Amino acid sequence: MQGRLSAWLVKHGLVHRSLGFDYQGIETLQIKPEDWHSIAVILYVYGYNYLRSQCAYDVSPGGLLASVYHLTRIECGIYQPEEVCIKIFVPRNNPRIPSIFWVWKSADFQERESYDMLGISYDNHPRLKRILMPESWIGWPLRKDYITPNFYEIQDAH
């Protein structure tokens, strides 16, 4: 079933794949990484002016990684905002997605956390570096194929 935004994107020739609706009735779309930045700008201009959240997850061990964006269009009505969920899948051997920091500034720490935990690189992000783990940390802790080190170095807080 195609939602309102999906129909609008089709009408304007923008490539995407409808993934249906979630349990709350929020339309979910899949966008290719190479199309994401231009579609993000279009969505912002269309009225999706609030990035509610961005997260990432490992789809399956050795499989794809996903970056998920929850966008809200508040101008439609403050009591019934229109929401959409965007999913972008990337291969784990070269997980690169254009950063949308320059569209929604609130993506800053969220994209950095996804980089830190899963190793997804957000191209053109101004400060893409680890945010939770030390810079010297090896690997991506939330990947399903991550091997946990069998020791942890206790560091002095001083």
Curated annotation (Swiss-Prot):
Any one GO biological process: photosynthesis, light reaction
UniProt KW keywords: Chloroplast, Membrane, NAD, NADP, Plastid, Plastoquinone, Quinone, Thylakoid, Translocase, Transport
Molecular function per GO: NADH dehydrogenase (ubiquinone) activity; quinone binding
Record has Coiled coil as a keyword: no
Annotated GO CC locations: chloroplast thylakoid membrane
Key word NAD present: yes
Reaction(s) the record says it catalyses: a plastoquinone + NADH + (n+1) H(+)(in) = a plastoquinol + NAD(+) + n H(+)(out); a plastoquinone + NADPH + (n+1) H(+)(in) = a plastoquinol + NADP(+) + n H(+)(out)
One Pfam family, short name: Complex1_30kDa
Subcellular location: Plastid, Chloroplast thylakoid membrane
Protein name: NAD(P)H-quinone oxidoreductase subunit J, chloroplastic
Taxonomic source organism: Lotus japonicus
